[in-house]
Each structure stands twice: as structure tokens, then as C-alpha cells.
């Protein structure tokens, strides 16, 4: 069965740069068939941060080319992983009034609450990478995971915001762009690892995942 599209992950690490290409299907969005992998020694990075754009770009090209050859496709865009000591996280809250008929909470209300939390002052030298909803409060009821469909006057979103240093994020993007690739999105590497390895039950109970990379 022919795939509908391809998805490409690019792991820009301190010791190596890895590329993975997968086929995807709209009929089964959870399914990914790995068709190409590539890796190259990482040049131009120190502890996960690009310190030499030209060398990093060359390493990216080498890794992507190897994966393209295996998959028999040409890559135009990637999801790029990011890590490093410049990554920081903080919690934030966003509160909105529920304005729908009967004060029933909709997805629009949830999105507004999350965006309000995201809009809290972020220093000019920081760039938001992820906004991760933790839970919600409806009026006086706390710890709600899925508020859509509930009724209330006041909706509060409690989120965890992950940011990176603007200079480090933009330098990473430039290195990828210089390799002839656009970036679909930036993903924090520990989150990517957790989503690919841990089960829902493990995340719910609580587990520690340690990624011992070259820059650790």
C-alpha cells in the first residue's frame, strides 16, 4: 500500500547527527513505516549547541543524504530535535470567562485559556518551544484533565512552558536551512524520546527516562 506522505526526524546531537524517514497514512495516523535512516559524525556542536554553522550544515547534509539514498526519496522538510543547557521551563496560568451557551466549555475556550497562559511575559532573549497543558480548573474544581463539555463560569489552564535561548534556536534553524531544508517544527529531544518509548501507563504512574548523549 502506497503511503500518503513522508515524515522526517532530524536529531542534531553533540556526537552524531541522525536522520530518520518514515511513511505515513491518513487512514492510520498512528502508523509510521521506517524506510530510511542516516547518521554522520557531528561537527560544529558543543553540548548540543551549534558553535560552527558551516560544519553543522555539512554534517546535516551527510546524514540526510544517507537516509534519502536508503529511502529512495528527496527530503524537503524535517522535524528538528533541540536540546542543550539553554533550555528552560516554567509554569504559567491562563484564565478566561466561559462565554458559550449554557456556559458549556468548548475547545475554543480551552485554546483561549492556553493562549492566555502562553502570552505571559517571555524575555526577549527566550523563544517558546512547547506549551504543555498540565491540567485545568473549572470555577472551584481543580485537577481536571479534559474540561470540554463541562459547565462553568471560569476556566483556568495550568501549563508548563519550555523555552530556548533565541540565539541558540535561530542558529540551529539556520544550520538546517543552509542544508536546503525547511523546519516543520522544533521538538525538545527529551519529549520526543518519551513519546516514542514510554507507554501512557508509564507516563501516568511516573517514570524517569535518562538519555545519556554525547554532551551529557
Task: Label each PLM-derived region with a short phrase.
Residues 1-14, 20-210:
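Nucleotide/phosphate-binding catalytic cleft detector across ATP-hydrolyzing
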Amino acid at each position: 500500500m502506497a503511503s500518503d506522505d513522508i515524515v522526517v526526524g532530524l536529531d542534531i546531537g553533540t556526537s552524531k547527527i541522525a536522520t530518520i524517514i518514515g511513511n505515513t497514512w491518513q487512514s492510520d495516523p498512528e502508523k509510521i513505516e521506517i524506510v530510511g535512516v542516516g547518521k554522520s559524525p557531528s561537527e560544529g556542536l558543543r553540548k548540543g549547541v551549534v558553535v560552527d554553522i558551516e560544519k553543522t550544515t555539512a554534517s546535516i547534509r551527510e546524514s540526510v543524504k544517507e537516509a534519502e539514498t536508503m529511502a529512495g526519496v528527496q527530503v524537503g522538510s524535517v522535524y528538528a530535535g533541540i536540546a542543550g543547557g539553554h533550555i528552560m521551563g516554567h509554569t504559567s496560568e491562563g484564565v478566561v470567562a466561559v462565554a458559550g451557551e449554557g456556559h458549556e466549555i468548548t475547545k475554543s475556550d480551552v485554546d483561549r485559556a492556553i493562549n492566555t497562559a502562553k502570552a505571559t511575559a517571555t524575555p526577549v532573549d527566550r523563544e517558546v518551544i512547547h506549551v504543555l497543558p498540565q491540567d485545568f480548573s473549572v470555577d472551584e474544581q481543580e485537577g481536571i484533565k479534559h474540561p470540554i463539555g463541562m459547565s462553568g463560569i471560569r476556566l483556568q489552564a495550568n501549563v508548563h512552558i519550555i523555552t530556548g535561548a533565541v540565539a541558540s534556536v535561530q542558529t540551529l534553524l539556520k544550520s538546517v536551512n543552509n542544508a536546503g531544508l525547511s523546519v516543520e517544527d522544533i521538538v525538545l529531544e527529551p519529549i520526543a524520546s518519551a513519546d516514542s518509548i514510554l507507554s501512557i501507563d508509564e507516563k501516568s504512574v511516573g517514570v524517569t527516562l535518562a538519555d545519556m548523549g554525547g554532551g551529557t
